[in-house]
Amino acid sequence: MKIIAKIPAWMLLCLFTLSPITETIYTSGLPSITEYFNTDGSTTQITSSLYYLGFALGILTLGRLSDIYGRRPVVLFGLCIYAISSIISIFAPNIETLMLARFVQAFGVSVGSVIGQAMARDSYQGSELSYVYASLSPWLLFIPSLGSSIGGYIIEYSSWHYTFVFFSLTGTVLLTLYCKILPETNPYINFSQTSKYFEVLKVVIRDKSLWLYAFIIGAFNGIYYGFYIEAPFIFIDKMKVAPSFYGKLAFLLSFAGIFGGFLGGYLIKKRHIHDQKVMILGLVFSVIGCSLLAIDALILQDKEVGQNIAVIMMFAPMMLHMVGHNLLIPMTLRYALEDYAKVTGTAGSVFGAIYYVLIAAVTFLVSKLHSDTIGNFALLFLVLSVSSAAAFYYILILYKKKLT
């Protein structure tokens, strides 16, 4: 595949992290939003499920458009939608309006994921692409945790409305900056018109490995974001932790993610360990972490422990999972679409839509399991982690059949 321009890694980072930081800042304010609109926590959490559905719709449509019209104009369009919907959210008179605005906000910000990944594949190939993903992934976890800290301070010292002020300003700044310096990386603009979109769609839908990769990404990100939408109610509401301190706790997950990312990069670049072995190691970390989380959550339901001990019992297992997350997911993204180089945007849009629908389903389940007990979501996470390991095992079987 020819390369016409390379998007700098820092610009990819901005695209990749815009949605995660938006969601983690927002989730810090879920208890406050629940109180403001005089509703229940389960209803408020559904705003996150709708966010991921809007994200899935954006990925499905905007990825296709980037194949036809180019990556750059679609990114600028998405950032514009993101900024406008954030402004609307500030003045939402009820929870239903906020739900709709969040859906539209997610549709716009989805360009950061689907177009960002397409631009990465346009710009880098092979082991260089793996290294770029592995190098960026620690920051993909650090910055969202920074979002929890920012959100915690905003909620503690002002109100949830100012989180959307932050989003609208961020979107406007990025839109202005990218209008000036964002390169066009798609070397096959209009290619998808001759390749026939529905023929590509048919191939993608029949690709078993792609569906399994989508399940793994959806499950792991569902665990990640599911924890973020449940954690504020556990720590701020139940344990009476200050919102700003809760934001600081989120950095524990960042440190684990950074370690996992650097470990993955080291194993690939310095030790020349095959990507598949790195992915298996990631699954091992995740299953162990989610198992411990389920055990600890069940213990906390039956026994009274100190606040500090309870925090450790909840965050330490999640840190193990996050190490595994950052060992596995970058490589999953690298391999899932390697056979779709000329239709990366189209294939990526279908792929991304699948796993974001799964993320929406997981967060919806978390909202439905939301109760006075904290063991429900932890058991769900364990099921998802083990199921992901089974899915990856089946991918290896399909890969071996492909070689023979």
Curated annotation (Swiss-Prot):
Alphabetical keyword list: Cell inner membrane, Cell membrane, Membrane, Transmembrane, Transmembrane helix, Transport
This protein's record includes keyword Transmembrane: yes
Topology term for the membrane: Multi-pass membrane protein
GO molecular function, one term: xenobiotic transmembrane transporter activity
Family the UniProt entry places it in: Belongs to the major facilitator superfamily. Bcr/CmlA family.
SUPFAM superfamilies (UniProt xref): MFS general substrate transporter
Any one cellular-component term (Gene Ontology): plasma membrane
Residues annotated as transmembrane: 3-23, 43-63, 73-93, 95-115, 135-155, 162-182, 216-236, 248-268, 280-300, 309-329, 346-366, 377-397
Keyword Cell membrane listed: yes
InterPro entries in alphabetical order: Efflux_drug-R_Bcr/CmlA (IPR004812), MFS (IPR011701), MFS_dom (IPR020846), MFS_trans_sf (IPR036259), Sugar_transporter_CS (IPR005829)
Full protein name: Uncharacterized transporter RBE_0856
Organism: Rickettsia bellii (strain RML369-C)
Organism superkingdom: Bacteria
One of the protein's GO biological processes: xenobiotic detoxification by transmembrane export across the plasma membrane
